[in-house]
């Protein structure tokens, strides 16, 4: 994936978080984002954005970053 693809993924996950944010707790929004990403994103998309969150993550909103960091953990559960 190119940097443009990563930027698109960051934008998408932030939009998903914004759509789920109804004033609830950050971890609740992150759980909904995680569920959406696990259901609808290809493994390569999840891998790319998860590696970004681990290495930097500064362009991710707080609930997006939390959700993305939980991707690997949710597979083990």
Regions found by a protein language model. Name each.
Residues 1-77:
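A domain-level signal for the structural core that forms small-molecule/cofactor-binding pockets
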């Amino acid at each position: 994936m190119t940097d443009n693809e990563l930027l698109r993924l960051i934008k998408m996950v932030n939009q998903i978080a914004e759509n789920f944010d109804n004033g609830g707790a950050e971890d609740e929004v992150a759980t909904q984002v995680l569920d959406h990403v696990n259901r609808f994103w290809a493994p390569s998309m999840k891998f790319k954005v998860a590696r970004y969150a681990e290495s930097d993550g500064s362009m991710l909103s707080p609930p997006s970053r939390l959700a993305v960091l939980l991707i690997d953990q949710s597979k083990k559960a």
